[in-house]
From Swiss-Prot:
Subunit structure as annotated in this protein's UniProt entry: The complex is composed of two ATP-binding proteins (PstB), two transmembrane proteins (PstC and PstA) and a solute-binding protein (PstS).
Function field: Part of the ABC transporter complex PstSACB involved in phosphate import. Responsible for energy coupling to the transport system.
Chain residues that bind ATP: G38, P39, S40, G41, S42, G43, K44, S45
Alphabetical list of PANTHER family matching this protein: ABC TRANSPORTER I FAMILY MEMBER 17 (PTHR43423:SF1)
Record-given protein name: Phosphate import ATP-binding protein PstB 2
Organism: Streptococcus thermophilus (strain ATCC BAA-250 / LMG 18311)
SMART domains, per the entry: AAA
Length: 252
C-alpha cells in the first residue's frame, strides 16, 4: 500500500485556549485530491493551516499532537518553516496577487531564494502558468499588472506562483468560493490535472466540487473528524448520520 505523504496523529489546535480541532488522526496520500468538508467553524481550515504551520502566525494559536511530512515532524524545533512552506504551498480563498506584473508574481518566490538567471526565471514562468492552465490567456501580457486580470485568472496566477517553488503538496482553502461558476470550473479542471504531479488538500463548501474532483473526502463537525473515506463511499454510503445529514443539506 502507498505510504502517506502526510500523517496527522492526535492533533488538537487551540485559539486562546478554546479548542478548534479535537484529537484528529488521519493520513493523506500522494497524487490525490482530498476534500475537507463541513459547516463553517467545523475546523477544516484550521486543520489545513496546521499542516504547514500557518497557525504560527497567530500568537493565540497552540498546537498539540503531531503532523508528519515525509516522516519528519513538522512541529520539531529543527523545522525550517520557510522551507516547509516552500514544499507545502498554499492557495487562499480570495485571489491575492501581489501589486506587480504577472511575471513578477510568478517568480516572486524564486527571487527570494536568490535565483536571478533570466532563462531559469522565464522557463519557470511559462511552465508554472501552463501548469495553472492560464498561460494561453496571459502569455502576451506577462508584464502587465496581475491586478488587471479577472478573478479566475488571478487565482490561477496564484496557483502558478505556488507551482514555481516546486512544492510537493498544495493546500487550497476554498479557492473557488469567491469566483463565478465558469472561473470555478476552470480552477477545478486545473486542480484535477495537477494531482498527477502533486498532492492536493482542498477545503470546500461545495459538495458537488468535492464529488467531482476529489479521491478522498473528510467530514468535520465541531472540530471533530466524523468520517474519512473514499469520496465515492462518502457520498453513496455515508457511515454516520451527521455525514448523511450534511451532504443531503439537512445540516449546515
Amino acid at each position: 500500500m502507498t505510504e502517506p505523504i502526510i500523517s496527522i496523529n492526535d492533533l488538537s489546535v487551540y485559539f486562546n485556549k478554546k479548542k478548534a480541532i479535537n484529537n484528529v488522526t488521519m493520513d493523506f496520500y500522494p497524487n490525490e485530491i482530498t476534500a475537507l468538508i463541513g459547516p463553517s467553524g467545523s475546523g477544516k481550515s484550521t486543520l489545513l493551516r496546521s499542516i504547514n504551520r500557518m497557525g504560527d502566525l497567530n500568537p493565540e494559536c497552540t498546537v498539540t499532537g503531531a503532523v508528519s511530512y515525509n516522516g519528519h515532524n513538522v512541529y520539531s524545533p529543527r523545522t525550517d518553516t520557510v522551507e516547509l512552506r516552500k514544499e507545502i504551498g498554499m492557495v487562499f480563498q480570495q485571489p491575492n496577487p501581489f501589486p506587480m506584473s504577472i511575471y513578477e508574481n510568478v517568480v516572486y518566490g524564486l527571487r527570494i531564494n536568490g535565483i536571478k538567471d533570466k532563462a531559469v526565471l522565464d522557463k519557470a514562468v511559462e511552465e508554472s502558468l501552463k501548469g495553472a492552465s492560464v498561460w494561453e490567456e496571459v502569455k502576451d501580457r506577462l508584464h502587465d499588472s496581475a491586478l488587471g486580470l479577472s478573478g479566475g485568472q488571478q487565482q490561477r496566477v496564484c496557483v502558478a506562483r505556488v507551482l514555481a517553488t516546486s512544492p510537493k503538496v498544495i493546500l487550497l482553502d476554498e479557492p473557488t468560493s469567491a469566483l463565478d461558476p465558469i472561473s470555478a470550473g476552470k480552477i477545478e479542471e486545473t486542480l484535477y490535472n495537477l494531482k498527477d504531479q502533486y498532492t492536493l488538500l482542498l477545503v470546500t463548501r461545495s459538495m458537488q466540487q468535492a464529488s467531482r474532483i476529489s479521491q478522498r473526502t473528510a467530514f468535520f463537525l465541531d472540530g471533530e473528524l466524523i468520517e474519512y473515506s473514499s469520496t465515492k463511499d462518502m457520498f453513496l454510503n455515508p457511515q454516520h448520520k451527521e455525514t448523511e445529514d450534511y451532504i443531503t443539506g439537512k445540516l449546515g
